[in-house]
Design a protein with these regions (language model features):
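Sec-dependent signal peptide recognition
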Residues: 2-8
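Short active-site neighborhood of thiol/selenol oxidoreductases, capturing the structured segment around
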Residues: 195-226, 240-242
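Oxidative protein folding and maturation machinery
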Residues: 19-193
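Structural microenvironment flanking redox-active thiols in thiol-disulfide oxidoreductases
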Residues: 221-258, 272-276
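C-terminal motif of bacterial Sec signal peptides marking the signal peptidase cleavage site
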Residues: 13-16
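Short, internal strand/loop/helix patches
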Residues: 257-289, 293
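Short acidic-hydrophobic, aromatic-tinged amphipathic segments that line or gate anion-handling sites
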Residues: 188, 265-270, 301-302
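Non-catalytic, surface beta->alpha helical segment in thiol-disulfide oxidoreductase systems
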Residues: 279, 283-314
Length: 314
């Protein structure tokens, strides 16, 4: 099942992504070998929906009862359990049972349940960040992470300095939300001519934030150029690709101009307005944004070309 594969990928990547600028609490020093052995033995088992329920009612049951067996007061448990297991549990809950439309109902509720102590609360913030926000997680999802961030910036468990990184992340996450008009910006071509994103005329626009010589950027470019569906849309001028370089090394940018097809728009942000005004999230490059004819966001900050194809085929 593709979702389960994504979850496994997310966990292998997210475990290493404990952000150094986020608040942590120290735990008691322990014997490392004993701790590792204990961590392997500990586990969390979510609630199980009654077998006789119809599928939709099972989903609703799991949304309501998934964490019933978890003791939110037991900080010893989260100090000792292998975090990979808890990241898996969180990923299954957030991506398997919570659609974007219900994120504002269930994600703040979970964070409130985790508010029994600062240690428990920051642990669940770490889980949410690893699954929903880490740039390497294929499960990252701002629509589900925003309610978590909004809870964090209001939490009495964090002081004003501890809330600052969450306030920053919230400001960025609120940009270019799905279904809303994408932030406009001016780009400059190699000829020196300038134009704006919103003046691109096409049924669809694919923003490709890229860096010169970036291996992952090359992979994404190859996926786009070898997609029969995308190439057909580009040839019919229904889809336009805007490759945008947000940084300052124009010599490197010019050296790599030939890396991209001539049919694509290849520009740079001369004033670094995208970064300075935080118009787009630049924490991970490459990044793709798919926009419709009115420049409403259909896909945000992703690298999944297959997902772009899926949206365009619907």
């Amino acid at each position: 099942m593709k979702r389960l594969i994504y979850i496994a990928l997310a966990l292998s990547l997210a475990v290493a992504c404990k952000s150094s600028h986020k608040p942590t609490t120290d735990s008691e020093p322990t014997n490392s070998s004993t701790t590792e052995q204990t961590a392997k033995q500990l586990n969390f088992s979510p609630a199980l929906a009654p077998a006789m329920l119809p599928q939709e009612q099972k989903m609703e049951y799991m949304r309501e009862h998934y964490w019933d067996k978890f003791d939110f007061a037991d900080t010893t448990f989260v100090n000792q359990i292998d975090s990979t297991k808890m990241l898996t549990a969180f990923a299954v809950y957030a991506t398997g049972y919570i659609p974007d439309s219900l994120a504002y109902k269930y994600m703040p509720r979970l964070m409130q349940r985790a508010s029994t102590s600062k240690r428990m609360y920051t642990y669940f913030l770490m889980l949410a960040e690893g699954v929903l926000h880490d740039p390497n997680s294929p499960l990252r999802n701002d629509e589900k992470y925003i309610p978590v961030l909004e809870n964090a910036v209001q939490s009495p468990l964090l002081d004003e300095y501890e809330r600052m990184p969450y306030e920053y992340d919230l400001e960025i996450a609120r940009q270019n939300r799905i279904g809303r008009i994408a932030n406009d910006f001016t780009y400059t071509l190699a000829s020196g001519r300038t134009a704006t994103l919103h003046n691109i005329r096409a049924d669809y626009t694919l923003i490709f934030i890229s860096n010169p010589g970036c291996p992952m950027c090359r992979e994404v470019k190859e996926q786009i150029t070898t997609s029969p569906m995308l190439q057909e849309l580009i040839e019919r001028k229904e889809l336009k690709v805007l490759v945008i370089y947000p940084d300052t090394d124009l010599e490197a940018w010019r050296e790599h101009l030939q890396d991209y097809p001539a049919s694509w728009i290849n520009g740079y942000d001369a004033d670094q307005r995208i970064e300075k005004e935080r118009l787009y999230d630049l924490k991970a490059i490459p990044a793709l944004y798919l926009l419709d004819k009115q420049k409403r966001v259909m896909a945000k900050d992703c690298t999944d070309v297959a997902y772009i194809e899926k949206l365009l085929s619907e």
